[in-house]
């Protein structure tokens, strides 16, 4: 009997594996990845229209790099973009004393080109070099900032959390602060550039790479939010920070962590804003396999990028097995009390289902605010109508300013 039971179990396991493989193959057949020529055409279009992930890139620089790329080899891709960026980096270095404004502009240009050279994740030696160069170029650019950018290193589980802290100039006392968390393929450098816009309101920011991305010390797991709890511990030690007025902002995958923190750390958070937060359906096998392969909203390599950031995942089968445990429904978190939240999303999002935003809105103990673009895609973005920078400056920053009790012009609001 035991032998028969064993055979039955083996047969059931094989059936499950075959079904999963068949499902994945069918999904990949239905949603083919872009060819190299299609990637080039779409990337140039996005550069011309200020669309992610080519916001701020000169189309001429992109075309120059593409002229040297003949295959989808990751190192070839990185080398082509580094060759273009290196020229701006060298010019910037030579101009720092004689023409600092031009040098700074060149550093920005080099940083953005290097960053696209490592995009979406530094999954090869060449892309790792491009990422290292991007960090170097960004920090060279940040040297021109006033108030300055502080590179913070927080000891954490035998390693360190690297973050960027920037505080308003000449603040009369402790200031409110936003903990900004990157997404799957964005980085703390991008967040730091964007969140500079909040400084005039008298609000500081601390930008950090999410688990599995950038310089983060750990990968994604159901307990990886402990990394951000450690950041909050650190911020509590800074006399320049108002401990009672700390908010969180998370973008896409960073919005997942923002949502978890709104619940797990609600006692230490004044408010949390999230853009396109993955909550539950996103983590289910059927949705994952249908949305990640050949997703036209994502430029390329969506599934490989995800597989690279999750702890214990080395294959598609691993990801299918591990993804469901990240669901906030499975973790029994959604019904719990949370900090006040703003949920930003697009009804036409093909990367994170809009139903996850609605699920988050309809759970918890306090009313949540939402900005849903019925014509918007991921993060609520809509080409030429609601591009990323406009959503950030017209929707997210005003909400954070209001929730942190600050009036326009950086004056304290009377609450």
Model-derived regions, located:
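Primarily recognizes the serine-hydrolase "nucleophile elbow" in alpha/beta-hydrolase
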Residues: 237-240, 244-290
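Mobile cap/lid helix-loop segments that gate and shape the active-site cleft of serine hydrolases
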Residues: 289-333
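Catalytic active-site module of serine/aspartate enzymes centered on a nucleophile-bearing elbow/loop
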Residues: 386-415
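Short beta-strand/loop motif that positions the catalytic acidic residue
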Residues: 337, 343-345
């Amino acid at each position: 009997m035991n032998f028969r039971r064993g055979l039955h179990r083996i047969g059931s396991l094989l059936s499950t594996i075959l079904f999963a493989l068949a499902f994945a193959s069918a999904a990949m057949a239905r949603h083919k990845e872009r060819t190299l020529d299609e990637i080039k055409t779409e990337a140039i279009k996005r550069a011309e229209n200020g669309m992610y992930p080519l916001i701020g890139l000169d189309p001429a620089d992109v075309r120059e790099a593409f002229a040297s790329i003949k295959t989808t080899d990751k190192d070839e891709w990185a080398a082509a973009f580094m060759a273009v960026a290196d020229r701006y980096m060298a010019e910037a270095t030579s101009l720092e004393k004689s023409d600092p404004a031009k040098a700074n502009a060149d550093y920005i240009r080099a940083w953005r080109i290097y960053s696209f050279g490592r995009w979406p994740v530094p999954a090869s030696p060449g892309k790792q070099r491009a990422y290292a160069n991007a960090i170097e170029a960004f920090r060279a650019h940040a040297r021109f900032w006033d108030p300055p950018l502080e590179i913070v290193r927080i000891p954490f589980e035998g390693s360190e959390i690297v973050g960027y802290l920037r505080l308003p100039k000449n603040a009369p006392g402790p200031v409110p602060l936003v903990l900004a968390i990157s997404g799957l393929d964005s980085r703390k450098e991008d967040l730091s550039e964007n969140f500079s816009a909040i400084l005039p309101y008298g609000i500081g920011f601390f930008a950090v790479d999410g688990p599995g991305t950038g310089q983060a010390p750990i990968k994604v797991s159901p307990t990886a939010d402990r990394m951000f709890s450690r950041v909050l511990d650190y911020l509590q030690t800074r006399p320049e920070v108002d401990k009672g007025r700390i908010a969180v902002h998370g973008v896409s995958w960073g919005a997942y962590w923002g949502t978890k923190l709104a619940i797990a750390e609600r006692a230490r958070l004044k408010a949390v804003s999230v853009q396109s937060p993955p909550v539950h359906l996103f983590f289910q096998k059927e949705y994952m396999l249908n949305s990640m392969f050949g997703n036209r909203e994502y430029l390329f390599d969506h599934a490989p990028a995800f597989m690279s950031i999750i702890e214990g995942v080395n294959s598609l089968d691993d990801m299918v097995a591990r993804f469901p445990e990240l669901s906030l429904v499975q973790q029994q978190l959604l019904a719990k009390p949370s900090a006040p939240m703003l949920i930003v999303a697009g009804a036409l999002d093909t990367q994170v289902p809009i139903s996850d935003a609605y699920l988050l809105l309809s759970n918890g103990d306090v009313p949540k605010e939402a900005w849903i673009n019925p014509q918007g895609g991921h993060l609520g973005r809509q080409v030429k109508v609601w591009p990323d920078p406009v959503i950030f400056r017209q929707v997210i920053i005003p909400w954070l300013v209001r929730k942190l009790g600050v009036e326009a012009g950086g004056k304290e609001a009377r609450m």
